[in-house]
A protein has these predicted regions:
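Segments forming oxygen-rich coordination pockets for charged ligands
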Residues: 1-124
Length: 124
């Protein structure tokens, strides 16, 4: 699988908002992204799709990794919740606390609706 590395908007500043840093859904590359972040002294969070209600774009076990600077790689949906999930992961890193987040059906957020009409549960 071909991988594309995307540069942040500004090279001189740390990312303040989540931004995809590596475009891949290969689990080995996603975990390597985490190892590289940790080796560089940066915090990183693993986000895993652990539940599906109705339909979903990805299977249970899909992963993404989010660095403390907001850079992320991997997918847990068809692209509709990755940025929101990255914000949650950054918050989890900041308070050093795991969390469970739901999007779509059964979620507390009315403005994040999955195109497939279902819902997903993520563990961070």
């Amino acid at each position: 699988m071909q991988q594309t590395i995307l540069a942040p908007d500004t090279a001189d500043e740390a990312l303040l908002t989540p931004q995809q840093a590596l475009l891949t859904d290969d689990s080995e590359a996603i975990l390597r992204f985490a190892v590289d972040a940790l080796s560089a002294g940066m915090g990183a969070a693993l986000v895993m799709l652990t539940g599906i209600r109705g339909g979903a774009a990805r299977a249970v076990g899909a992963q993404m990794v989010v660095r403390e600077d907001g850079g992320y790689c991997g997918f847990v949906s068809g692209g509709c919740v990755e940025s929101a999930a990255a914000f949650e992961a950054m918050a989890a890193l900041a308070c050093v606390e795991d969390r469970v987040v739901r999007y779509g059906e059964g979620s507390p957020w009315f403005d994040i609706v999955l195109p497939c009409g279902g819902g997903i549960t993520l563990h961070i």
